[in-house]
Every structure is written in structure tokens, then in C-alpha cells.
């Protein structure tokens, strides 16, 4: 497909405001699903739009299935994030603009570029299919894939494959083809301080009884030492091959050269392979509403990112034990567990990935990078659990350098889409 055709198709998709988290855009999500269904139907694939109870519309499709051939499932998602503050956008998020080799618009990189990639891969191979191809274009990834387990259970035959290519990751830098090998897991919970007293004047109780925020602050401070190292006992780390991130590049991603980082031997390992705890929110009186009272109640939500191989049940137990062991002054504190999810390891030494890296290295101008993702992709866990024998491959056309996924001024490098199409086509031919 010529670059102008890629731009035309991606632009048509970006114009559809398929924001899955906003009930006012449910019709747009339906429109987006129908657009995708028409794309693959026009290629002659067997296609359908499917919703499970409480879910958003997804598109599944497949070529004619030959039992003598390997089967590859190509995944992407057609829903997008909200746009946030429009004043921070340089262009209309749903009126795509091409500038300096990039297409700007909400969903351009995350993840409508993935749909464009898969469409063109199928189109290139259709006349002489080296493998069976199945398509799965989800409609609720941006809200955490809440019905994915039910969807897989009800549509297992439509999704089962030898290889699952998820085009919802991306490239560590512009022009650097990248394979994602790990995703961190996650547990989170709430620390709740509830001192058995009523709010009292600080002139009456101050200095005699600890207020709730003092208690909460001491617990939060116990999570890290002076070097910023996590102090929760019993957690592990994962040992995997990853490409080292430069400090200057990380600061560029963070948006400031002035921010101070923790001292660490390896930024990549710290970010992708080790546990990390953050305080997400605190409930306590607002500064503007403050009065001279000793407050009895305060709470904080904490998030613990897990190494890819860490058991989330074990991690939640270790987190709770740490909180309860570090309660100061015999205060009244409880820990309320919340969500948890496993990490993912995608072995880069398996056959399809090995062949894909060979294709990357012959088509792109730079050698392939191997990265982890510090966050989670919830549906990836469902695939790993339900299809344990399938090879999982995490790639994408987006980039972490200028892509701005989920942020204002999201964009995608157009030649990344071209080269990813070419790389996947070459790989699919070679593995047959």
C-alpha cells in the first residue's frame, strides 16, 4: 500500500470519535466497529461484529482456514482515549493532520495504526496465503478490557492460534524497531487510618494524640529507603534481556531535563523488571478547607507494579504485611486490597519472534531493541492464560519518543506503519 493510501485510511479511522469510556460516544464506538468490519469484509474475509453482555463491539474475522497451515491471530483495538484539555492540542484531535512525516490525531498511534497494519498485511498476502489469518479488533481496551475473559470464553474458536501478534505496543525510539518482551503486573489497595475519636481542636489534642495524616505519612515513608529503594520484603525481580534506556531519553519522555532520578545501575531494569510503588491519591481535608483540628481520618490509594514473573496474590500479601508491620503509635489502620493482575513474559527466542527480528533488521535502518513495559496490558494476561501454548508477540507502529499516546498531540510516524507492514508480511511468508 502506498503511503498516501495509509494516510487516507488512517485519517478516516481517526475521524471516528470512538471513545469507549464516554457513554456519549457509544454510537461512535459502534460506527468504528462497523467501519473495521467493512474493511475486512471487503477483502473477502469471514467477518462479524460481536458484543458480549456489558461489552463494547469487537470485530473478528478470518481467512479460509487450511488445517495444514499454521494460524496467526492479529490483534489491535479500535477504541481510543478521551482527548482531555483541548487547549493543549495544537490541532483538532479528530481532524487528522500530516506534518513532518507524522499523522496527528487521537488514536493515530494507539491503536488505529494497528488496524491499518493488519488490514494491509492481509491485503498483501491474500492471493497466496502462507498461513491462516484470524483478526481480532477489540473495542474496549482503553477501559481495561473488562469483558475480555467472557469474550474469549464465548469465541474461543475464533481466536485460538499458534501465534498471537498484538500490535498495541510500540518502538522505543523513532526508527528503532522494537519487540516488547515483558509487561509488569499490578496490585493496588487503600490504606485507611481511622482514629477512634472525634475531630478535636488542635489546642486540646495536638501533641497528645497522633492525627491521621501523621500516621499515614509515616506508613507511606516506610515504603522506601533514602536511596529510593523499595523496602517491601518478599518481592522478586525478573531477569530478562532488555535494551538499556539512556537517562537523557527517559528525561525527554518525562518532559523535563531538570527532574532528578533515583540512582540505579540500570534504568531499564528498574523500570521494566523490578517492583515499584507509587501513591496515587490521598483523601484528607483540602488545604483551602483546613481548620485547627486534629483529624481522625485519612486514606491513601497505593499502586504496586510487579516484576513480570511475580505472583500477584503473593505480592498483595507482602504489601498488606508491610503496611500492618509499619503502623506507628498503635494507631487504628486497615489495608483494603483492590485490583491485581499478573505480568507477562513474551519470549523473544521463540520462532516467530526470531524471524520477525530478522525481518526488522533487514528492513529498518536500525537493529531491533528489546524493551519491557512498565505498565500492564490487561487483555494480554487473558491471552496467556487461555492460550498458553501460543507464541505471544508484542509490537506496534507507535513510538515513545513523540507518540504522546493518551496525551495531547498524539501522533504516529507514517513510515513506521509501512515498515511494520513489510516486516510482518515477510515474516509470515518465511514461517510458512
Regions found by a protein language model. Give the residues of each.
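N-terminal helical capping/dimerization or prosegment-like subdomains
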Residues: 1-86, 297-301, 314
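Active-site nucleophile and cofactor-binding loops and adjacent substrate-binding regions
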Residues: 50-53, 107-111, 370-375
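Active-site metal-coordination/substrate-binding segment of hydrolases
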Residues: 69-137, 403, 415, 419
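A common structural junction motif
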Residues: 78-79, 223, 227, 321-330
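Fold-level recognition of mixed alpha/beta catalytic cores in primary-metabolism enzymes, strongest
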Residues: 108-258, 268-275, 386, 408-419
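A generic structural motif
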Residues: 109, 197, 304-311, 341
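An extended, acidic, His-containing surface patch that forms the Zn2+-binding/catalytic region
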Residues: 173-174, 231-289, 293-297, 309-318, ...
Amino acid at each position: 500500500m502506498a503511503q498516501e493510501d495509509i494516510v487516507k485510511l488512517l485519517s478516516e479511522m481517526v475521524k471516528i470519535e470512538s471513545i469507549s469510556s464516554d457513554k456519549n460516544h457509544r454510537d461512535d464506538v459502534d460506527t468504528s466497529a462497523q467501519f473495521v468490519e467493512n474493511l475486512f469484509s471487503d477483502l473477502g474475509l469471514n467477518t462479524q461484529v460481536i458484543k458480549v453482555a456489558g461489552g463494547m463491539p469487537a470485530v473478528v474475522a478470518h481467512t479460509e482456514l487450511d488445517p495444514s497451515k499454521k494460524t496467526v491471530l492479529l490483534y489491535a483495538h479500535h477504541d481510543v482515549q478521551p482527548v482531555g484539555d483541548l487547549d493543549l492540542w495544537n490541532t483538532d484531535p479528530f481532524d487528522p493532520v500530516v506534518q513532518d512525516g507524522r499523522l496527528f490525531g487521537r488514536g493515530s498511534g494507539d491503536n488505529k495504526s494497528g488496524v491499518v497494519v493488519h488490514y494491509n498485511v492481509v491485503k498483501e498476502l491474500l492471493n497466496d496465503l502462507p498461513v491462516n489469518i484470524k483478526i481480532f479488533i477489540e473495542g474496549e481496551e482503553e477501559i481495561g478490557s473488562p469483558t475480555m475473559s467472557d469474550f474469549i470464553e464465548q469465541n474461543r474458536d475464533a481466536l485460538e492460534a499458534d501465534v498471537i501478534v498484538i500490535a498495541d505496543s510500540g518502538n522505543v525510539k523513532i526508527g528503532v524497531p522494537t519487540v516488547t518482551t515483558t509487561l509488569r503486573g499490578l496490585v493496588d489497595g487503600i490504606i485507611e487510618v481511622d482514629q477512634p475519636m472525634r475531630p478535636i481542636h488542635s489546642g486540646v489534642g495536638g501533641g497528645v494524640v497522633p492525627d491521621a495524616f501523621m500516621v499515614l505519612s509515616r506508613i507511606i515513608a516506610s515504603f522506601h529507603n533514602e536511596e529510593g529503594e523499595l523496602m517491601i520484603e518478599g518481592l522478586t525481580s525478573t531477569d530478562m534481556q532488555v535494551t538499556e534506556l539512556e537517562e537523557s531519553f527517559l528525561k525527554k519522555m518525562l518532559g523535563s531535563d531538570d527532574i532528578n532520578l533515583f540512582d540505579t545501575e540500570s534504568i531499564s531494569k528498574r523500570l521494566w523488571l523490578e517492583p515499584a510503588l507509587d501513591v496515587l491519591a490521598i483523601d484528607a481535608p483540602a488545604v483551602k478547607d483546613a481548620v485547627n483540628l486534629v483529624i481522625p481520618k485519612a486514606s491513601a490509594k497505593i499502586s504496586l507494579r510487579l516484576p513480570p514473573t511475580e505472583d500477584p496474590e503473593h505480592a498483595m500479601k507482602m504489601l498488606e504485611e508491610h503496611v500492618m508491620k509499619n503502623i506507628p503509635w498503635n494507631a487504628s489502620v486497615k489495608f483494603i486490597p483492590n485490583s491485581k493482575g499478573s505480568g507477562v513474559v513474551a519470549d523473544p527466542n521463540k520462532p516467530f519472534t526470531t524471524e520477525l527480528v530478522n525481518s526488522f533488521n533487514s528492513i529498518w535502518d536500525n537493529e531491533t531493541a528489546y524493551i519491557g513495559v512498565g505498565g500492564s496490558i490487561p487483555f494480554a494476561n487473558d491471552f496467556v492464560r487461555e492460550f498458553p501454548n501460543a507464541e505471544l508477540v508484542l509490537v506496534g507502529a507507535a513510538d515513545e519518543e513523540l507518540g504522546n499516546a493518551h496525551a495531547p498531540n498524539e501522533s504516529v510516524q507514517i513510515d513506521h506503519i509501512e515498515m511494520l507492514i513489510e516486516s510482518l508480511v515477510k515474516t509470515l511468508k518465511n514461517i510458512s
